[in-house]
């Protein structure tokens, strides 16, 4: 009888020890990454732009991205993200004169 009680207590202890303990029992932490932030990508006075092609970025239809906090992948969707020189004092992109470099995502 003592053997059965010992076996019962040991099995209950084993089940209690193996049960998850409120949250991640292996101390893993969930890390979410939305995408690449565009703020540190461009330099030398260039601005991030979304262009409709990646083969030749001169003369393309490019739109400037005014908010740098939006991840590039969400802002451009299926278009190509590029760093382009601004064409005028207002920051508009002139496609024929713009020197654009594609951003690898």
Swiss-Prot record:
Record family assignment: Belongs to the fungal hydrophobin family.
Assembly, per entry: Self-assembles to form functional amyloid fibrils called rodlets. Self-assembly into fibrillar rodlets occurs spontaneously at hydrophobic:hydrophilic interfaces and the rodlets further associate laterally to form amphipathic monolayers.
Protein name: Class I hydrophobin 1
Compartment list: Secreted; Secreted, Cell wall
Described function: Aerial growth, conidiation, and dispersal of filamentous fungi in the environment rely upon a capability of their secreting small amphipathic proteins called hydrophobins (HPBs) with low sequence identity. Class I can self-assemble into an outermost layer of rodlet bundles on aerial cell surfaces, conferring cellular hydrophobicity that supports fungal growth, development and dispersal; whereas Class II form highly ordered films at water-air interfaces through intermolecular interactions but contribute nothing to the rodlet structure.
Signal peptide start-end: 1-18
Keywords annotated in UniProt: Allergen, Cell wall, Disulfide bond, Secreted, Signal
Keyword field contains Disulfide bond: yes
A Gene Ontology term for the protein's cellular component: extracellular region
Disulfide pairings: 42-83, 50-76, 51-62, 84-100
């Amino acid at each position: 009888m003592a053997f059965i009680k010992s076996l019962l207590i040991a099995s209950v202890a084993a089940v209690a020890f193996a049960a998850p303990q409120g949250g991640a029992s292996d101390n893993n932490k969930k890390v979410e990454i939305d995408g690449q932030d565009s703020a540190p990508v461009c330099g030398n006075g260039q601005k991030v732009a979304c262009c409709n092609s990646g083969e030749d970025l001169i003369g393309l239809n490019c739109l400037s991205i005014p908010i740098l906090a939006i991840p590039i992948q969400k802002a451009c969707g299926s278009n190509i993200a590029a760093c382009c020189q601004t064409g005028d004092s207002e920051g508009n992109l002139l496609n024929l004169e713009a020197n654009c470099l594609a951003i690898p995502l």
